[in-house]
């Protein structure tokens, strides 16, 4: 049986040691609207950002997450990239450079 989608979008979670900087980038530079944050005891704070019909969840960890050495694109499983299709690339690149 195939799944019946309840939402025509993907929600993505990113766990980070650098929550404030990452939140500032997606919220202040890319302009994603922020929904109320959710504290998750023992894990960190989940910051929710609206991206079209999708939600980007930035999990700012309470305790430092071990840094794993890099590898080739397909060398391990997990989220390796996130694509946001936009139509104003030049303006966004200028904002990123200013950030």
What are these regions (language model features)?
Residues 55, 62-65:
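Active-site/binding-pocket entry motifs
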Residues 43, 64-70:
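A short, acidic/glycine-rich surface segment
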Residues 3-6, 13-56, 91, 98:
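Core segments of cupin and vicinal oxygen chelate
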Residues 7-9, 79:
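Core-facing hydrophobic residues within beta-strands of well-ordered domains
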Residues 11, 57, 85:
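Conserved beta-strand segments that form the floor/walls of ligand-binding pockets within enzyme
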Residues 58, 72-75:
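Helix-adjacent hinge/juxtasegments
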Residues 1-4, 71:
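A detector for short, charged/polar N-terminal pre-domain segments
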Residues 16-20, 63, 74-99:
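Vicinal oxygen chelate
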């Amino acid at each position: 049986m195939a799944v019946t989608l309840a939402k025509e979008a993907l929600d993505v979670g990113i766990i980070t040691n650098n929550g404030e900087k990452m939140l500032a980038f997606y919220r202040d530079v890319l302009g994603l609207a922020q929904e109320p944050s959710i504290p998750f005891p023992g894990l960190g704070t989940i910051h929710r950002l609206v991206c079209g019909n999708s939600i980007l969840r930035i999990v700012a960890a309470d305790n430092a997450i071990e840094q794993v050495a890099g590898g080739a694109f397909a060398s391990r499983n997990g989220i390796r990239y996130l694509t946001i299709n936009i139509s104003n690339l030049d303006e966004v690149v200028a904002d990123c450079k200013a950030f």
